[in-house]
């Protein structure tokens, strides 16, 4: 009887193969995704996936962890070196899990937090309906300057003094420009607040020294996922310097384990470690090319007739390009993103700061990220070609199937994962 279920295995493996073939021939511009190197993929598919470990290396609650411990200790060494921190905890299994640990470790129900609203690019885990709310925090949101596409510093300073929060959170999901950590962290600390920086989207840019340096600008803690501009497997990390009293750090560590996780997905942990080594070796060049590509794509899209956000600020300082398509169709991003998918161009619709929340399914914006296409070797010239593909679909109204054929041929030339020990740098950066 069990033999009859083999077809489900075959179907699943078939769908996986179909997905991999499809993805290799699309232009993936999802800002929260990336591609791992063969070495990292090997680590994630290793026998570490079968192992269980709880607690700190050399202090496990399970036996048989001697090799796992060595890998995790290497990881702590590499992450602290990469980010210039005192501590790095690789155990969180996602960025949201890392945020949970900080909220549960350093705050109490009823404490106040100031975060970025989701309409302004804040992450759902920061909100009353996310991890912050589940902790029972009273959530306030940063005043936002739509023209600057950033936190309003003067109004934020006033809000901090009025609210006297226990924690303030910088960072988010719509993140083209650095946040004013340097300006606002001292004010937060005046009222006794912890300063947390959610670097999920920009962790690789921080590692590559191409974005702001939160720990040097006043943040106590960086939380992040490890699979966006930091091109590792899906997972999380908490990076921090010494802050407060020893007992406060102990509370944070206790919140991670046994608070919000037990075993920490050791195969993914191993992949994070190899990715950290790759970023120490290649991260500065990778991050620099990401920012160059984002700027090039933004400029090219503007030249093709799109309304790209942030023109007076150089469009972007990160991997993200934000486009307002509300003038192209009543459904705006809700129309554009599926149409582009038909053409093999993958990105996501996104609320813009002036959108009401009820427009979540038909928001004004598109969020574009260039980190994955950068990692497969694309540079500024390729960004211009991508902009032309997008114009053909959304402005020229060409048949997406026709554009898809051209996208397939274009993407076929970019199949290696660079900025890695497997393939080194792209050839054009070796010259």
Swiss-Prot record:
UniProt site positions, description: Plays an important role in substrate specificity: 227
Residue sites binding (6S)-5,6,7,8-tetrahydrofolate per the record: 122-124, 245
InterPro entries cross-referenced by the UniProt entry: PyrdxlP-dep_Trfase (IPR015424), PyrdxlP-dep_Trfase_major (IPR015421), PyrdxlP-dep_Trfase_small (IPR015422), Ser_HO-MeTrfase (IPR001085), Ser_HO-MeTrfase-like (IPR049943), Ser_HO-MeTrfase_PLP_BS (IPR019798), SHMT-like_dom (IPR039429)
Main location: cytoplasm
Pfam families for this protein: SHMT (PF00464)
Cofactor annotation: pyridoxal 5'-phosphate
Subcellular location: Cytoplasm
Protein name per UniProt: Serine hydroxymethyltransferase
